[in-house]
Each structure stands twice: as C-alpha cells, then as structure tokens.
Amino acid sequence: MHPSYQKLLSYVSEIKHLNHSSAAAVVVMQNDQIILEHYEGVHGNEHSNLIGIDSMFNIASARKSYLALAIGYALYEKKIHSLDDCVSKYLKNYDQQIFQGTTIRHLMTHSHGLDERDDGSIYREFAAGESWAYRGINIRIITELFKYLYDYDFTQLLKERVFMPLGFKSTEWSTEESEALVKVIDYPEQKATFQLYPYDDGMGSNLHTTAREFALWGNLHLNMGRHEGIQVVPEDVIRLCTSIQSLQYDDGRLPANGLFWYVQEKAKERSEIGECVPKGSYQILGNTGPLLLVVPENHLVVVRMYNKRYNYGGKNYLHYLREFSNRASDAFTIPSCSKMHRL
C-alpha cells in the first residue's frame, strides 16, 4: 500500500478513537475505480456486528445532498421558476411577515436567517442574505416545498430516477431496525441506538447508506450525472447542485455553497473544506461523521464514515474537517493505480 494511503487511514483511525466512535469506513474512487477501501470496528459500542461492505451508516444531515438533487430537478423541470423566487410564492402556511424576502436560494445556501424555538415557533435571526448560519429549519421547509411542487415525496423521485438506475440496494430512509444498520453513539457511556423515523418521506434523519453507495453517489455528481456511460441525471441538474449558488457576503470568512453542498472557491475560515483542496471541489457532511468530498480536478471521490454524534474537535471541529480534506486531497493528487487496497 502507498505510504500516503496508510497515513490517511491511520489518521481516520486516530480520530475514530479520540471521538469514541465504534466504527469507521473509507472508500476512495479515482477515475471511476475504487482504489482504496477500509473498514474497522463494530456496529455499536456493545457486542455488535463487524463493520464491512454491507454496513449501512446513518448519514444525518449529509442527506441534504439528496434533497439538493431533487430541488435541482424541480428547477430543471421548471416546477420552480428561479432560485430567487420567494418561498412564500409557493408555501402559504408560514408567517408571511417573518418570511418576507426569504428566497429558495437563501434556504438552499444557509443564508435564510430563520431559526426555530423549542415550542416550534419560527423567528428571524438575521435578514435574509446578510449572513450565514446552519439551522435545520430550512431542510424541513425545502422538503415541504418539493412535496407541494410534485405532490409526492422527494424520496420517491430519487428512488425511481436515480437509485434504481444506479442499482442501489443499500440506500434507504430506514423505518425499522436491521442488522445491516450501524447504530449511532450519542455518548460513550450510553448504549448506541438505531436512528430511525416512522416514515421514509425525507423529513427524518433516518437516511442510511453504505460507504460504497455513498461514494457512487459522489461519483455520479463528479461525472455530471453519468453512470457507466449512461446519462442518469441531466447534466444541468448536477451543475445547479455543485456550482456556487450563494451570494457574496460582507463577511469574507463565510463559506460558499451550491445547493447545500460546500463548494471550494477560495479558502474560507468557516468552511469545512481545507485550503489545500483544489478550486471547484465540493463536500457534504453529517454530524454523525459521514463526509463526502468530490475533487473534479483529480477525478477523485473520498468517503469517510463514523457513527459518533458530533464531529471531533468540539468548538474547533472545523479545523479537523479541513485537515482531513487536505490530507485526502494530497494523498490522491498523483494519479493512482487501479489496484484496489482493502484492510
């Protein structure tokens, strides 16, 4: 194994240990081939199945990339006229005064300025477009928007138009316990639990997938919607999702986003992507440890999976996320041989 590959895997194992995760997986694709694959640990912090190819991790908020593709379809098919349409043009069930001036672009780039109290009431944190803040409310609103536009859940569109053509068997919004599912650890001293939701409508944080299928999801984007020579998703849909859609902020530290994806323009203090990662790369992350990095310049897809809630580093977590992407990008900059390594 190339020393740089081993160095990256050692780093993944170190963070797994430091953050009290019981599981880790790495899949790297370059030039449409799996060149590195690694699995370690077990499905929970008690007696559990060993992690392997068929282990399905909860990817938490990395599910945004799936919702993003569905909204890309809605734009492509003219269900939405423009990203700059006010969300109130479509959804009338929200306080129009609070939502005033809030566009679909704002919701898709975390610049909407909305937040939610414990009692479910919505308030404005800052004027739409003036800043950036990661809040979960936009995911719910966009999920509702898709159902309003199509009269069915976005998960159905993905199953029919994307998952079936790709041959996905292990990507699902899980509603029942299964031995294939990796449990999530909230606290090291407590038993890990299944992260389920009663429905597969996309509203819950119950999307599970294997490291391989997550990598293939990234590779579909890398190849602009093509899979094995077939155009599965229109190229324009992918381009909408993975090119910068956020507006310029007065605060230069704030990250750039496509449709939810972090997109590398130049190094930003509050971005999850490291400064050494080439321009045009994009990344999605979940708070249970899944990370998907796509580097078009190197025709590279990197997947890293954990099963511990909250990424390592506490308030300094962005440093470790950037460090991983820097290390991964550096390790695979030189075109790699097609031989696959598995530990």
Task: Please report, for each region that a protein language model flagged, where it lies by residue.
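Active-site Gly/Thr loop motif
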Residues: 182-205, 243-301
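Active-site-proximal alpha-helical segments within enzyme catalytic domains
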Residues: 141-145, 205-227, 290-306
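Structured C-terminal helix/loop/strand segments within mature extracytoplasmic catalytic/sensor domains
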Residues: 281-343
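Active-site helix/loop module of the DD-peptidase/beta-lactamase fold
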Residues: 7, 53, 58-61, 76-115, ...
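Flexible glycine/proline-enriched surface loops and loop-helix/loop-strand junctions
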Residues: 51-54, 123-128, 138-140, 195-203
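Active-site-proximal binding-pocket segments
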Residues: 174, 179-183, 191-231, 241
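Active-site SXXK
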Residues: 12, 26, 32, 55-83, ...
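Short, conserved catalytic-motif segment at the N-terminal edge
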Residues: 2-57
